[in-house]
A protein has these predicted regions:
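Hydrophobic membrane-insertion alpha-helices, especially the h-region
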Residues: 4-21
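A solvent-exposed interaction/effector surface
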Residues: 17, 23, 36-39, 43-47, ...
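Short acidic/polar N-terminal linker immediately downstream of export determinants
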Residues: 23-29
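Short, well-ordered beta-strand elements within core beta-sheets of diverse protein domains
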Residues: 29-36
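A structural signal for short, hydrophobic beta-strand segments that form beta-sheets
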Residues: 71-78
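Ser/Thr- and Asn-enriched, surface-exposed coil loops between beta-strands
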Residues: 80-83, 105-107
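Extracytosolic and intramembrane catalytic regions of membrane-associated proteins
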Residues: 83-85, 96
Length: 310
């Protein structure tokens, strides 16, 4: 019997020793996620505006004041340039945590969600605190995974799916005209017809859809350039001009809808370029997929918006 008691005592001593050896007085809990997103986009959706948290939070929430996840309620309590301070609250505790931004390069960041626990001197409390820390670390990881999935989706960030492509039709037959208001569809397609007539007259071929760029000169005057990609360069009269695009890179997005939706696409590409610190060497333009003169319902118009970049 004494031997059994002695063995139990030794086991207890070993267990307690192991607890003190393996669980430090201060337990740091961190989860790190590498996210392919720009610093600007992260700030917009995570730091600058609390309402954007609902868009990526994995459990349903109607408010950003208290974000529930499993057995915790997460509450944003403070923010600065790179850190969001968040209280993780359950029935027993309020744990103060930090969400830290660590930029790596133009389009990649690390996000660290971290906190620390004082485990005390009581072995039982140490084990309980360790289990609590392990659970919270799992929550951090799951929440960061949800954030990563959202932030790496360009369509979620910019409202359009943005892709990179190359200039395939560098040679253009173009013409410009000015109007006192935004050009009408009739005015645009009048010039497109003139270009098409010249293409037939000169016995050359179209290699792509009509292209359009409208520039506001002042509050009531616009300059419009219309172009059609062609297969070879020949001479035209002064009303028409041959333009040569640089064989470089383009951003492109598909747009469905009229002028207002197309302008939103231009704005989204402007923001994308700013976020990714790109430079545009030439003017953006839209490619007219739908023949707008034949389709009066602008909600059915299909276009592509292109932005040259390097």
């Amino acid at each position: 019997m004494k031997k059994i008691v002695a063995v139990i005592f030794v086991i207890i001593i070993l267990l307690v020793s192991a607890i003190y050896l393996l669980i430090p007085a201060t337990l740091i809990v961190s989860s790190i996620s590498t996210i392919n997103v720009t610093e600007n986009a992260y700030r917009k959706f995570i730091i600058d505006n609390n309402t954007n948290w609902q868009k990526w939070w994995p459990s349903f929430t109607t408010t950003t004041e208290n974000l529930n996840y499993k057995n915790y309620q997460f509450k944003i309590i403070n923010k600065n340039i790179n850190v969001v301070e968040i209280a993780a609250i359950n029935d027993q505790d309020t744990i103060y945590t930090k969400l830290i931004l660590a930029p790596l390069k133009t389009d990649t960041i690390n996000v660290i969600w971290t906190t620390h626990f004082s485990t005390g001197s009581n072995p039982l409390k140490k084990v309980q605190t360790y289990q609590k820390a392990k659970e919270l670390k799992s929550h951090f990881t799951e929440l960061l995974n949800s954030m990563k999935k959202f932030l790496e989706n360009d369509e979620a960030i910019y409202s359009f799916k943005i892709e990179k492509t190359k200039v395939n039709d560098p040679l253009l037959l173009s013409s410009k005209f000015k109007t006192h208001n935004y050009p009408t569809t009739t005015e645009i397609y009048k010039v497109i017809k003139e270009l098409k007539d010249q293409i037939v007259l000169k016995d050359i071929k179209e290699t792509g859809n009509p292209m359009l760029h409208v520039r506001m000169l002042d509050s009531s005057n616009y300059e419009t350039m219309v172009a059609i990609p062609i297969n070879k360069e020949i001479l035209f009269d002064n009303k028409f001009a041959i333009k040569k695009m640089i064989l470089g890179n383009l951003l492109v997005t598909d747009v469905k809808g009229g002028v207002a939706n197309i302008q939103k696409a231009y704005d989204a590409l402007d923001t994308y370029i700013l976020d990714h610190r790109l430079i545009s060497p030439a003017m953006p333009y839209e490619s007219l997929i739908t023949n707008r003169i034949l389709e009066s319902d602008t909600s059915k118009w299909e276009s592509k918006v292109y932005y040259p970049i390097f």
